[in-house]
C-alpha cells in the first residue's frame, strides 16, 4: 500500500502530526520502537492510580487554541503544580516566593525579602559570572543558592556548579507574593484518566506498529538510492539519503517521513554523538499507605540524596485510594542505548546539531521534529503547536 507519510514516533509530536494529516484525508502510518503509545507522557494505571512512567507531566499553556485542541481528546482536572523542595529536614515552597523566603529567613513582607536578597548579592560582589555557581549567586544570593539550587543542579547535570557554564541559568524567577503556583500560564491541569488516552485518540483510525525501530521497519528508497544500496532490500547500514519513496520491509511505500527520533542516530552518528542527560526511575507500590508525602512532587535539593525528586502519582488526580505509588527519579549519564531525556545545549552540542541540520536539509522527503529530532527541550503545549505547524506547512506544500 502507498502512504503519504510514515511517522516515526508515537509520542505527542508524532501523534498530533498524524492526527492533523489523517483529518485532512492523508494516508499515514505510525511506528514506534517502544511497546506503547504516547512516548514520554505515557501513563499506566496501577491500583486505580495513573502512574506517569517517565516522570511528572503537568500540562500548562496560555495558548487557547492548544488548550481547546487537547480538550478534544481528554477531560482535564484543575490540578495546580505546587512542588515542594526538601533540604535536610526543612521544606520550602517552589517556585521561590514569599512562602519560601518567610520559611528561610522568618520575614513576612516583600520589602524584607528583596532587601535580604539584595544584601547577599551585594556582599558577593560578582559582576561577571564565570560559571553557573557565580551566575546563580548573583541572581538569588547565597542562602537560596546553597539550599535550593546547588545540590539539585549538580545532581541534574552530574557536575559541580563551578564546572558548568553560566548561560545554563539565564534567570531564576523570584516571586514576591504568597503564590505557590509554579506556572503562570492561563490553563493548567492533568487529563482525568491519564495521558495515554490522548495519544490513543489522536491516532484513532491510523495504523500503528509498536516495538519496531525505523531501521528494522524500512527497506530503503527507490530512486537515486539504488546505486548506494538504498532501494528495496537495502542493507541495514544504508537507510539515510537519496530521494523518492521509502519502502517498508512489508512492501508498503511512503512518500514522506516524519522522524521524531534522535537526529544524530538517524545519520548513524556520522558527525559524532549529541549529548543528553538520562533518568532512572525507581517505582514502589505502598500497600496500606494512603498518603506518603502529601504532595505530588517533592524535590530533594541536597547533593547527598541520590535522587532529585519523589513523585506521588495519586495527588495528580486527587486520589483517595488506600494505597499509593511513588517514583524516585535519579539523574544519570547518557550513553547509546539509554533513554535520552534532556539535550545538553552547550556550545559544543549546539554546533554539532547545526551540522546535522545541514545533513537533514539534504534529506529531500524526510522531516525532523520533536524534542529528539530538533535537539530541543519542549513543554507539551509547544510540542503540539510545533507538530500542528509542521502539518499545516505540509498541507500548504501539497496544495
Regions found by a protein language model. Give the residues of each.
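Central helical "cap/lid" subdomain
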Residues: 38-39, 49-54, 215-219, 245-304
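Short, solvent-exposed loop/turn segments at secondary-structure junctions
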Residues: 11-13, 35-36, 99, 154, ...
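Glycine-rich FAD pyrophosphate-binding loop
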Residues: 22-44
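C-terminal segments that line or cap access tunnels to active or ligand-binding sites in enzymes
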Residues: 265-398
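Dinucleotide-binding Rossmann-like beta1-alpha1 core, especially the glycine-rich loop
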Residues: 47-123
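Active-site/ligand-binding neighborhood in enzyme catalytic cores
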Residues: 88-92, 99-221, 245-254
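N-terminal Rossmann-like FAD-binding beta1-loop-alpha1 element of flavoenzymes
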Residues: 5-30
Amino acid at each position: 500500500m502507498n502512504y503519504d507519510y510514515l511517522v516515526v514516533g508515537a509520542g505527542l509530536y508524532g501523534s498530533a502530526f498524524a492526527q492533523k494529516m489523517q483529518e485532512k484525508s492523508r494516508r499515514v502510518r505510525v511506528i514506534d520502537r517502544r511497546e506503547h503509545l504516547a512516548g514520554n507522557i505515557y501513563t499506566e494505571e496501577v491500583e486505580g492510580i495513573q502512574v506517569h512512567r517517565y516522570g511528572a507531566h503537568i500540562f500548562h499553556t496560555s495558548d487557547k487554541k492548544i488548550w481547546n485542541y487537547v480538550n478534544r481528546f481528554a477531560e482535564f482536572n484543575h490540578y495546580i503544580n505546587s512542588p515542594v523542595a526538601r533540604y535536610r529536614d526543612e521544606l520550602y515552597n517552589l517556585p521561590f516566593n514569599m512562602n519560601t523566603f518567610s520559611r528561610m529567613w522568618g520575614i513576612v513582607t516583600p520589602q524584607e525579602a528583596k532587601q535580604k536578597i539584595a544584601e547577599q548579592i551585594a556582599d558577593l560582589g560578582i559582576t561577571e559570572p564565570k560559571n553557573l555557581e557565580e551566575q546563580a549567586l548573583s541572581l538569588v544570593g547565597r542562602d537560596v543558592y546553597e539550599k535550593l539550587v546547588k545540590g539539585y543542579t549538580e545532581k541534574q547535570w552530574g557536575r559541580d556548579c563551578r564546572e558548568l557554564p553560566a548561560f545554563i541559568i539565564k534567570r531564576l524567577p523570584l516571586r514576591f507574593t504568597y503564590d505557590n503556583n509554579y506556572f503562570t500560564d492561563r490553563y493548567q491541569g492533568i487529563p482525568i484518566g491519564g495521558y495515554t488516552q490522548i495519544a490513543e485518540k489522536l491516532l484513532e483510525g491510523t495504523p500503528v506498529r509498536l516495538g519496531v525501530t525505523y531501521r528494522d521497519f524500512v527497506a530503503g528508497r527507490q530512486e537515486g538510492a539504488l546505486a548506494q544500496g538504498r532501494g528495496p532490500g537495502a542493507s541495514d547500514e544504508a537507510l539515510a539519503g537519496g530521494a523518492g519513496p521509502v519502502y517498508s520491509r512489508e512492501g508498503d511505500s511512503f512518500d514522506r517521513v516524519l522522524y521524531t527520533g534522535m537526529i544524530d542516530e538517524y545519520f548513524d552518528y556520522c558527525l559524532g554523538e549529541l549529548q543528553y542527560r538520562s533518568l532512572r526511575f525507581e517505582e514502589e507500590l505502598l500497600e496500606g499507605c494512603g498518603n506518603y508525602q502529601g504532595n505530588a512532587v517533592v524535590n530533594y535539593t541536597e547533593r547527598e540524596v541520590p535522587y532529585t525528586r519523589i513523585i506521588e502519582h495519586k495527588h495528580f488526580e486527587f486520589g483517595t485510594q488506600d494505597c499509593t505509588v511513588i517514583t524516585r527519579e535519579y539523574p544519570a549519564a547518557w550513553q547509546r542505548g539509554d533513554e535520552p531525556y534532556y539535550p545538553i545545549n552547550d556550545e559544543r552540542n549546539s554546533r554539532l546539531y547545526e551540522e546535522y541540520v545541514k545533513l537533514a536539509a539534504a534529506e529531500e522527503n524526510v522531516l525532523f521534529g520533536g524534542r529528539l529530532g530538533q535537539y530541543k527541550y519542549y513543554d507539551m503545549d509547544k510540542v503540539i503547536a510545533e507538530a500542528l505547524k509542521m502539518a499545516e506547512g505540509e498541507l500548504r506544500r501539497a496544495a
